[in-house]
Amino acid sequence: IDLILDEPESKFIKALIIVPTRELALQINKAIEAYSYFTGTSSIAVYGGGSGADFSQEKTALTQGVDIVIATPGRLISHMSMGYVNFSKLRFLVLDEADRMLDMGFQPDLLRIIDITNPKRQTMLFSATMPQGVLKLAKTMLHDPATITIALSKPAEGVTQSAYLVKKKKKIPLM
């Protein structure tokens, strides 16, 4: 959000976050709205399965200008096909849960979306697992990528963990 605020004011989409499900799109949009509340940064969740009114609201936001779009691939392709999106000034592209999107068969849609984005963008790909499909996708869209691997978390050695069943009214006094 901070980097988007440094961008000149425009009607163009500055950041695109592609996610596999409407639930994740809504969750991320809610977080962005909270983080950017006092900044004037605008965002919209674009996903299928809603009413025609939802599509119309999405179209209005996409054509009149929005800073951050959080979208599912299928619905975004629908808007692209109708000429409602312009990614020529896109600065940031995020693929969240890339492994899940590939499992759901979205690879052709992802490649189609990536193909029309500004090539001078920063691209981030997040995945819980790194199967061959994700590695192949990463090679086609990332330039000089940095990989961050997080190990499974375990309790620190020498620390004993315990759980106690306590009635609600006794929780505070027992803490």
Model-derived segments and spans:
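Short internal alpha-helix immediately C-terminal to a glycine-rich phosphate-binding loop
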Residues: 1-8
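Conserved nucleic-acid-binding Ia/Ib motif block in the N-terminal RecA-like helicase ATPase lobe
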Residues: 8-81, 89-92, 135-139, 147-150
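Small/polar loops that bind or transfer phosphate-bearing groups
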Residues: 16, 20, 47, 102, ...
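Post-DEXD/H (motif II) to motif III coupling segment of the RecA-like Helicase ATP-binding lobe
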Residues: 28-34, 86-156
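Conserved beta-strand scaffold positions in the cores of enzyme catalytic domains, especially
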Residues: 43-45, 123, 145-147, 161-165
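Conserved phosphate-coordination/catalytic loops
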Residues: 53-56, 104-108, 166-170
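Well-ordered alpha-helical segments embedded in enzymatic catalytic cores
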Residues: 75, 109-112, 170-174
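Conserved interdomain hinge at the start of the Helicase C-terminal
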Residues: 158-175
